[in-house]
Amino acid sequence: MNELDLNQYMDRVGRQARAASRAMARASTADKNRALLTIAAAIRRDADKLKAVNARDVERARANGQDAAFIDRLTLSDKAIATMAAGLGQIAALADPIGEISNMKFRPTGIQVGQMRVPLGVIGIIYESRPNVTIDAAALCLKSGNATILRGGSEAIESNTALAALVAEGLSAAGLPSEAVQVIETTDRAAVGRLITMTEYVDVIVPRGGKSLIARLMEEARVPMIKHLDGICHVYIDADADLDKAVRVCDNAKTQRYAPCNTMETLLVSQDIAAAALPPLCRIYQEKGVELRVCPATRATLEAAGFTGLVDAAEEDWRLEYLAPILAIKTVAGLDDAIAHINEYGSHHTDSIITENYSAGMRFIREVDSASVMINASTRFADGFEYGLGAEIGISNDKLHARGPVGLEGLTSLKYVVFGHGEIRT
């Protein structure tokens, strides 16, 4: 597709999305739920067809030398298809935030002022190899009354196109515009460049991908984004920590899964409890094959306890998101030092303190400048489902517009509404 054809194609997609967004904004909850449940039924009905289409994407990815982890993300297994269908039902069961009026108050002039929750409008979703994101993102945008333009990875183009056809079927069956969810059907990477600059059509971009994708979009996008670049998450073991809790939480925060953005990457330990806390915890880490990158004080503590195989932490280790069985460990003077380290080196994603000291815990959650802050809980809980949002479209570590896991409410905004009885301003 040449540049002229691409621009014309993207403009058409944008115009259709903008028109559809107006219809979606006034769609009833019943119609939106009907669409979601119809899509779920269509996915179950066409499961074998979806697997056949997906197999072609998988075969092509293997031929291109993609690794096993990539193939796993790309594959639509029976379980993945069932999960997609079930997820649609769960989103249909969520309360519809659109049209809610809150914060109503009477003014001395006689008017009544409040806020109404409304859709953002048109949301562009850019993601990589997971075809299930096509359904997850479409469902959240649909339920929140938005239109969406989906640009998945070229490796999943056939799977994404097939899923989009089922979404269009569900929208039409509910009397909603099929253009409310559109998948960009070209694999030309220039389509991403156009999508992120279409301020006349697109209200927000939500990228779901690796650091290189997010970094590129931060450089080039003109449309506002809901995103996070890194997940450099910390757990701090305070001097007043319960050791059993510390070991249990820190083990889970690092080793339950290594790849998610809410996995702990740096462990901070108060010098007053390091000799008691570090050996039992690091023994677990080494048994599980976790490489330990340590500061000098941590090395001294662990070597005194008989540990070997430690790696000296470099300055850059405090700023790294490993997404791997690697953990940076630093012994700190105390709470002040821990908070300062997190605010200096962290990515403002998720950080947790292990302590039995109420004042220390409250200081931590007040002063650590992150989207999620926790007391005596694993960073792995930083997730829309775990927070009771039902589902999430992503996690934001920005301060505007949404922060933390982004569910239905994160895909909406508030406008002021005023009720009067003929009042005039004097």
Swiss-Prot record:
Keywords: Amino-acid biosynthesis, Cytoplasm, NADP, Oxidoreductase, Proline biosynthesis. It comes from the Bacteria. It is found in: Cytoplasm. GO terms for cellular component: cytoplasm. GO terms for molecular function: glutamate-5-semialdehyde dehydrogenase activity; NADP binding. Pathway: Amino-acid biosynthesis; L-proline biosynthesis; L-glutamate 5-semialdehyde from L-glutamate: step 2/2. Gene3D superfamilies: Aldehyde Dehydrogenase, Chain A, domain 1, Aldehyde Dehydrogenase, Chain A, domain 2. The keyword rRNA-binding does not apply. It is an enzyme of class 1 (oxidoreductase). InterPro entries: Ald_DH/histidinol_DH, Ald_DH_C, Ald_DH_N, Aldehyde_DH_dom, G-glutamylP_reductase_CS, Glu-5-SA_DH, GPR_dom. The keyword Cytoplasm applies. This is Gamma-glutamyl phosphate reductase. It comes from Cupriavidus necator (strain ATCC 17699 / DSM 428 / KCTC 22496 / NCIMB 10442 / H16 / Stanier 337). The gene is proA.
